[in-house]
């Protein structure tokens, strides 16, 4: 059997330590580009696009293996710095646990949930934040997605849902926070997230994170509906060297926030050294 094709990677910067940025979703490539460009002034930055659905089944293990191939050359110089956003933060922890010698430090931005208590808190917070119109639109899109069979239309519906969720998860976004639009991958989201939840249900995660040797820093907005303190508590049971840093007046995606973006970049740069 032929090995799967390598994944797409974008490069930024010409000097400094290697930093790898993992996007969220799963299935939302390109959203880390503003952060990559900013860090490119001081670091050599890799922005991999996680594998899309279709060629091989998508699992956490598949994404870890793909990332290992991306890092083959940078690792010749030594361990790298790994930064993940949302789902990408969850993948960063999985990689650091399964290949601990590859990673010098880990930064988690708006990390996702690893237990039922945290997920229930997230769902409750999202419900509180949604306006009646947003709730109706989300319910309508979810109903259409449930019966749609065309891949392209499913991806379009998924992208609309993602935009609505991002709006609810933000606090005071900058007026000029438009991001480049890349195709979303609804099937990739579904396959990967099902496997991630299975790992939690079987007790594999977060227990396997006890193998992480690198220091871990969580950067979390105080207005992020993902419950940062609860997520930190679930991880700290297994990761002794984990630090929680909260940004005031900040939603899920710090770099788009009017009151938090500058503090976020300052903190992220300090964490990466």
Predicted regions and their residues:
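Flexible "cap/lid" loop of the alpha/beta hydrolase fold
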Residues: 107-146
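Conserved hydrolase catalytic core segment
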Residues: 79-122
């Amino acid at each position: 059997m032929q090995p799967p094709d390598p994944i797409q990677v974008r490069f930024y910067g010409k000097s400094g330590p290697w930093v790898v940025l993992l996007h969220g979703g799963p299935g939302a490539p390109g959203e880390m580009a503003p952060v990559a460009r900013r860090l490119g002034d001081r670091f050599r930055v890799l922005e991999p696009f996680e594998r899309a659905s279709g060629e091989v089944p998508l699992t956490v293990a598949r994404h870890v293996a793909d990332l290992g191939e991306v890092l083959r050359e940078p690792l010749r110089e030594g361990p790298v710095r790994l930064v993940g956003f949302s789902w990408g933060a969850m993948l960063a922890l999985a990689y650091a646990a399964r290949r601990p010698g590859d990673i010098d430090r880990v930064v988690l931005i708006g990390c996702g949930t690893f237990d039922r208590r945290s997920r229930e808190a997230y769902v409750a917070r999202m419900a509180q934040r949604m306006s009646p119109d947003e709730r109706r639109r989300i319910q309508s899109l979810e109903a259409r997605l449930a019966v749609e069979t065309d891949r392209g239309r499913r991806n379009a519906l998924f992208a609309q849902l993602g935009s609505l969720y991002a709006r609810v998860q933000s606090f005071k976004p900058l007026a000029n926070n438009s991001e480049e639009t890349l195709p979303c991958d609804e099937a990739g989201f579904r396959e990967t997230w099902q496997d991630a939840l299975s790992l939690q249900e079987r007790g594999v995660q977060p227990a396997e994170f006890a193998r992480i040797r690198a220091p871990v820093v969580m950067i979390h907005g105080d207005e992020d509906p993902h419950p940062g303190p609860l997520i930190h508590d679930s991880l700290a049971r297994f990761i002794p060297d984990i630090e929680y840093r909260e940004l005031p007046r900040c939603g899920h995606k710090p770099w788009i926030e009017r009151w938090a973006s500058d503090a976020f970049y300052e903190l992220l740069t300090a964490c990466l050294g």
